[in-house]
Amino acid sequence: MAQWQWQQEHEAKRRIEALVFEHRCELEDDGLDPDEIDRRCAEFRAQLNTTAAPPPAVVDEVSQPLPRLLEQLLSPDDRAAVEQAAVVCRRRYPRLNGEGDVTGSKAHAITYLHRDGYFGRDHGPLLKKITGAMARDWRGPPLTVRCVEHHVYTEGGGLVLEDHRDLGSSLSLSVLLSDQYKGGAFTTTEDGVTTAHVPRVGDGVLFASETVHNVSTIESGERRALVVELWTGPATTHDRSK
């Protein structure tokens, strides 16, 4: 087998196992019996293997390099709408405030804004503005919204998992909503080189989802951000997997 073929198969298996792990976390949060969790995960893995797609494409990085900064993507009114959406979703969907996300913690709260199609339905023009900016230079197959998430990092919180990637997605965007904090540097790592991005409030960092990215630990204050992922799979209305 050629090296590139092996790499493609390896990446496909890695993506599937990452999705299965996320699914297992969600089932554990729902309080299911361990045997039932194993059974459902086996079914989910079989389904993913049956419908496995080629690795997600990304934009032409020669003409439009990634990561890149989308300056002042969100206006003050846009940011206020996002914050209000987070308030609504925390009240309306209390069980779906990111409990199934392996990166969440008491100091890193994640709220799904796309649950039951809420954000696209109640904030359609804003979502279209965001996804349009993300996919402006897209050269691959049609993209759909995988997730719209509101993140709040408080002291001690961060995204420090080694080799963290948004597996299965094609494009990811992180928009800074606040700047009253210390620490919390947003970085991407490619080919062993780590780059620190310094967005202003309202700026978004757009990057290929398979890029390793992290948020350093918050030393004080509160870091708020909007995260949107696009992929070639079906639109989700529950969490990141379904």
For every predicted segment, state its role.
Residues 1-61:
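RS-domain-like, Ser/Arg/Lys-enriched low-complexity regulatory segments of eukaryotic spliceosome
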Residues 5, 9-16, 30, 34, ...:
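Amphipathic alpha-helical protein-protein interaction segments
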Residues 13, 17-20, 34, 38-41, ...:
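Generic preference for well-ordered alpha-helical elements
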Residues 30-34, 38-39, 93-97, 140, ...:
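Short, flexible/disordered secondary-structure transition segments
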Residues 128-242:
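Catalytic core of non-heme Fe(II) oxygenases with the double-stranded beta-helix
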